[in-house]
Regions:
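Phosphate/oxyanion-binding loops and surfaces in catalytic or ligand/nucleic-acid-binding neighborhoods
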Residues: 28, 65, 128
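Solvent-exposed residues in well-ordered beta-strands and their adjoining turns
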Residues: 11, 61-63, 102
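Short, flexible loop/turn elements at secondary-structure junctions
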Residues: 12, 20-26, 64, 143
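Conserved flavin/dinucleotide-binding core of flavoenzymes
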Residues: 5-7, 24, 33, 54, ...
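Flavin (primarily FAD) binding-site architecture
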Residues: 19-42, 59
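Conserved beta-strand-loop-beta-strand element in the redox core of flavoprotein oxidoreductases
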Residues: 1-16
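Central beta-strand plus flanking loop segment that forms part of the substrate or channel wall
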Residues: 42-69
Length: 202
């Protein structure tokens, strides 16, 4: 008999059918799928055990690159945490200073109003540059901790989880194969996600 095809039914009513598929979405999204038949218990446990890092990027658009050095970066002990030049080696007098925070620092920056967040960021820069508010044109935010599809930025393997959990997550389920940055040796980067997709195909 011919092997059963994989049927994907979407929330908008669309249906797709294939001989085999590669599932490369984060484990949070995998948990939202109604699998029929259901996934093996061992795989479900592995999916639930994998955690994801909470990352926030808070770019500041500036009318002038007041930090001067194209290679500028800076670490602080404030919630704003880490800064780097987001428009490095790009032409123009304006620039983007990227504020990058993880964990509780990212949570705190993402949870406050835009004006308050700007104040926190500007205060973190003040010891090095003084008052830079006149240079600020706009500020933006993306917080992966509340991303509706991943609820995290990249997979965060706890102690021993790399060897305990990853092999189970990689195991195919019927005609569904799994890939993604969380299953890559170069884990946490899009290059790793791409390589894991190539590995799944082979």
């Amino acid at each position: 008999t011919a092997p059963k095809k994989v049927v994907i039914k979407c929330s908008n009513g669309s249906t797709f059918e294939a001989d085999k598929i590669i599932c490369s979405i984060p484990t949070f999204a995998i948990k939202q799928i109604q699998w029929n038949p259901i996934l093996p218990t061992q795989k479900i446990d592995a999916i639930h055990s994998l955690q994801y890092a909470r990352i926030g990027k808070f770019p500041i658009v500036c009318t002038e690159r007041f930090w001067k050095d194209e290679n500028f970066d800076m670490v602080t002990d404030t919630p704003a945490h880490y800064f780097y030049h987001g428009t490095k080696n790009q032409p123009g007098s304006q620039g983007v200073l990227m504020c990058y925070a993880i964990g509780e620092k990212a949570d705190s920056l993402a949870s406050v109003h835009k004006n308050q967040r700007e104040e926190i960021i500007l205060n973190a820069l003040k010891p090095a540059f003084g008052n830079v508010k006149p240079f600020i044109k706009n500020s933006l935010m993306y917080y992966w901790g509340t991303d509706p599809f991943s609820y995290g930025a990249y997979a965060f393997y706890g102690k021993d989880k790399w060897f305990e959990v990853m092999p189970t997550l990689k195991q195919a389920f019927m005609n569904t194969h799994f890939a993604g940055e969380h299953l890559a040796d170069w884990q946490g980067f899009m290059e790793g996600a791409l390589q894991s997709g190539l590995d799944a195909v082979s």
